[in-house]
Amino acid sequence: MEQHTPRHRPSGQYAAADTRRAAIIDSALALFAKAGYLNSSLAKIAAEAGTSATVITHHFGSKQRLLMAVLEARDERTMRTFGELGPDSGGDDVRALFREVLALAAYNLTQPGLIQLYTKLSAEAGDPAHPAHAYFAERYERVAHSLASALQRSFDAGQLRPGTDPESIAREILAVSDGLQVQWAIAEGRLDFVGLYRAHLDRLTQALTVDGQGLDEPAGAERLP
């Protein structure tokens, strides 16, 4: 009986496909950030990427799946740089935690398209029918839980004042961060996001810690050059 050797796609074809997918994701990110998801058609994304809507459908299946690929790419970039704050991230120093949060905010400013994407989509996703609604709902819960868990370690270590509610503080930090991101985007980058965020975290550290001291780093240390 004749045996057939399975045909495998050459590695060069895989690389070309990956490159094409990455280019489509970058183009979709730029268009979603500028016009929002609802006002971005596959035809417009294809024109931005220099390809066709058929090619995009071949790689992603639908605009909704492309959106999720864009959001996942955003998270992967952040994870590669900072990892995940959470119960297993180690450490109980609240100042180290806040400095890491501040460094993440500064890193995000190096990718203004991602901030514009996030602020635009998070506003749209308030509608339960929006395809990114579940993503943002899950993400807020996950990030709030991670921050609250890290703050709980600081509380258990005796760094924070009695009566501190880690969950409430985590939600406050997220609210301030998101609010400043919106203002930064509207001001087209002219707002001193990092300086304002650092000032808030410094006041928060003084209010929460038993020793009443602020962040250890000198003012402006985390500012972008």
Residue positions per predicted region:
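Hydrophobic alpha-helical connector segments
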Residues: 69, 82-115, 166-173, 220, ...
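Helix-turn-helix
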Residues: 2, 20-23, 27-69
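Amphipathic alpha-helical segments used for helix-helix packing
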Residues: 110-131
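Amphipathic alpha-helical packing segments from all-alpha helical-bundle domains
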Residues: 79, 83-84, 96, 112-113, ...
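Hydrophobic/aromatic-rich alpha-helical bundle segments in the mid-to-C-terminal region
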Residues: 116, 129-141, 156-204, 208-225
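Short, basic, alpha-helical segments at the C-terminal edge of helix-turn-helix-like DNA-binding modules
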Residues: 72-79
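N-terminal intrinsically disordered/low-complexity leader segments
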Residues: 1-19, 212-225
